[in-house]
Curated annotation (Swiss-Prot):
InterPro entries the UniProt entry points to: HepT-like, HepT-like_sf, Type_VII_TA_RNase
Name of this chain's protein: Putative RNase AF_2433
Keyword field: Hydrolase, Nuclease, Nucleotide-binding, Phosphoprotein, Toxin-antitoxin system
Gene3D superfamilies reported in the protein's UniProt record: bsu32300-like
Residue numbers covered by motif RX(4)HXY motif: 90-97
O-di-AMP-tyrosine: residues carrying this PTM: Y97
Protein function: Probable toxic component of a putative type VII toxin-antitoxin (TA) system, probably an RNase. Probably neutralized by cognate antitoxin AF_2432. Neutralization may be due to AMPylation by AF_2432.
Quaternary assembly: Homodimer, probably forms a complex with cognate antitoxin AF_2432.
Enzyme Commission identifier(s): 3.1.-.-
Domain of life: Archaea
Amino acid sequence: MRRERYLEKIEYIVEALSEIPERVKTPIEVSGVFYNLLTSIESAMDISAMLVKDLGGRVEDDYSNVEMLKELGIIDEELAEGLKKCNGLRNWLVHRYNRVDKELVLSSVEEVKALLLKFIQRVEDVLEKIEP
């Protein structure tokens, strides 16, 4: 398995999430929060695809990959639904950036952080079982 690549992506997510300030005051800070959320979620979706492939599944779209991880018992229903919502937020940030509800996104930061950190923990558990 490509353990190093997983660990690089995990490290990126943890670092990007830790750089998000508790309060944002300026437009550039808001943009930074949006970017770090977007790229953290994207990295989590990359990890999902990598896991699906490395566990013998067929890689599809992000939502299907998350669903496959649920079916394989890697993540539970609650985490799967949370990751799908995160991916929806990522898509919204990418495709509707100029019309994004800033307050809605900022109010979801802590929830997204918690979900991604929970996902990382599950991935680390799986990696430990596969490649101790």
